[in-house]
Amino acid sequence: MLPLNATIVQINEESPLVRTFFFDFQFETMEPGQFVMVWVRGVDEVPMGLSSKNSITVQKVGEATSKLFELKEGDSFGLRGPFGKGFSLPSEGEKTLIIAGGVGAAPLAPYAEAARSAGSEVHTVLGARSAGDLLFEKRFAEAGKVYISTDDGSKGTKGFVTDVLTDLDLSVYDRIAVCGPEIMISSVFRLLKDRQVLEKSEFSLQRYFKCGIGVCGACCIDKSGLRVCRDGPVFSGVQLLDSELGKYARDASGRRVKI
């Protein structure tokens, strides 16, 4: 698949290191949780989760994302996709819990909106380092009740999303959707397992991608061999039992890197 040319029509600064780039067309069939391969001309092609049908939300962390931050309205980049498996939508009347940390809120914001539209009662636990780093709080609030946690206590509960979850009755939820830094995801995974609600959960994983379509095997998960780009990036909690989650990932050479 050749990249589509995406012209930037609007840039929102969500925080000093996070921006949302809106482009001039929509992925009408996008499932919340799917990703696109973003071709930053002259630099690299990198995977990004969609934060709406016509936007990606980018955290400045490396060469490719730094180059994206140099782009202005009217500039363009290439897009391939959407790829992968997104989050499963709830049925009408079901109760959904969303657990979002940092830039992991980006793919979960459209999921919250879609779940609400499907007739689900939506609750969100939204975490970040500080109040200024909270992403899409308004979008989550429009979908339902929001619980906030910040590392520094500048808003909501001081601590992590797991501190909020400890005080919630998780048995009342029919579906639980999780996305965020892997250290957060692994902590949530253990908590959900201990509370015996893991079978209700889905997690979005980040791994190094090369092809983005399941051919190269660079993003396979030990021990199952599931491909994050093709079989994921969203997996059920049960699928991730006895996996590498929270332990290590692989770099571009395939070498294990401790998380």
Curated annotation (Swiss-Prot):
Domain annotation FAD-binding FR-type: ranges: 1-89
CDD domains (UniProt xref): DHOD_e_trans_like2 (cd06220)
Species annotation: Methanosarcina barkeri (strain Fusaro / DSM 804)
Entry-linked PANTHER family: DIHYDROOROTATE DEHYDROGENASE B (NAD(+)), ELECTRON TRANSFER SUBUNIT, DIHYDROOROTATE DEHYDROGENASE B (NAD(+)), ELECTRON TRANSFER SUBUNIT-RELATED
CC cofactor: [2Fe-2S] cluster; FAD
Role description: Responsible for channeling the electrons from the oxidation of dihydroorotate from the FMN redox center in the PyrD type B subunit to the ultimate electron acceptor NAD(+).
Cofactor descriptive note: Binds 1 [2Fe-2S] cluster per subunit.
Lineage, opening ranks: Archaea, Methanobacteriati, Methanobacteriota, Stenosarchaea group, Methanomicrobia
Gene responsible for this protein: pyrK
Quaternary context: Heterotetramer of 2 PyrK and 2 PyrD type B subunits.
Name of the protein in its database record: Probable dihydroorotate dehydrogenase B (NAD(+)), electron transfer subunit
Similarity remark: Belongs to the PyrK family.
Pathway entry: Pyrimidine metabolism; UMP biosynthesis via de novo pathway; orotate from (S)-dihydroorotate (NAD(+) route): step 1/1
